[in-house]
Amino acid sequence: MNHLDKNAKKSLGQNFLRDKNIINKIVNVFNIENEKVLEIGPGQGDLTKELLKKAKKVLAFEIDKSLIEHLKNEIKDLHFELRDQDFLNVNLNDDEFKDYYVVANIPYYITSDILLKIYRSFWNFKGIVLMVQKEVAQRIVAQKNSKNYSKLSISSQYLADVKIEFIVNKNSFIPAPKVDSAVISLKFKDNIDKENLEKMLKFFLVCFANRRKKLTFTLNRNFNSTKVKLAYEKLNLSDNARIQELDVSQIVLLFTYLN
């Protein structure tokens, strides 16, 4: 254990991945040979170094000054670019991010923020491989009628083909987090309506606002009740239906009929 391990900052969600086997598996989820890779929170550079063996460029975002200093000293590869910048403040719509893969062991406390940030510029990215909490991974891939089914499930599955690649034991990290993790992959779909993306994401949020109540309760407060009734008839939905009983395709159709 080095001084950076000992001084890992809980406030930044720092858990350094040291398991070489897991790192190699992450690097090989997608074929990143000669591809551009964006890394969020490179930490001490263990994953970064392996990515650089395959990728033609690795662009990393880090905000911890001590880690930035370490990375500058540790990695001299010309294909590596390190930015002292909060990823959540980056404009991902910029053309410079076109055709990147995102591969990262991210700070868990901002997982949803990171995902939604990428989702809002999904067309620039070829795919995502992220280390997340196991519980979050289960929410992302959850199907209807599951207790884990949520707006994150719908948003993720609407935009991408999602998969839990493998589970990672908490002891693969220094310091070890309290829970196990999972590596997820997302490959974005080609047929997504970019123009209505914000409206769609907001609709998912609205639908899950009162998940214990009938969905009509929420919809009638946000849409014309006649439109809601007609949409239900077209989809052959019961008035008693709750959001967790509808799959992604039904929710997307519901959005279409209401708009």
Swiss-Prot record:
It comes from the Bacteria. Transmembrane segments: none annotated. CDD domains: AdoMet_MTases. One of its GO terms (molecular function) is 16S rRNA (adenine(1518)-N(6)/adenine(1519)-N(6))-dimethyltransferase activity. The keyword Lipid metabolism does not apply. SUPFAM superfamilies: S-adenosyl-L-methionine-dependent methyltransferases. Its EC number is 2.1.1.182. Its main location: cytoplasm. It catalyses: adenosine(1518)/adenosine(1519) in 16S rRNA + 4 S-adenosyl-L-methionine = N(6)-dimethyladenosine(1518)/N(6)-dimethyladenosine(1519) in 16S rRNA + 4 S-adenosyl-L-homocysteine + 4 H(+). It holds the Pfam family RrnaAD. One of its GO terms (cellular component) is cytosol. S-adenosyl-L-methionine binds at residues 15, 17, 41, 62, 86, 105. InterPro entries: KsgA/Erm, rRNA_Ade_diMease-like_C, rRNA_Ade_Mease_Trfase_CS, rRNA_Ade_methylase_Trfase_N, rRNA_adenine_dimethylase, SAM-dependent_MTases_sf. Specifically dimethylates two adjacent adenosines (A1518 and A1519) in the loop of a conserved hairpin near the 3'-end of 16S rRNA in the 30S particle. May play a critical role in biogenesis of 30S subunits. This is Ribosomal RNA small subunit methyltransferase A. It comes from Mycoplasmopsis synoviae (strain 53). The gene is rsmA.
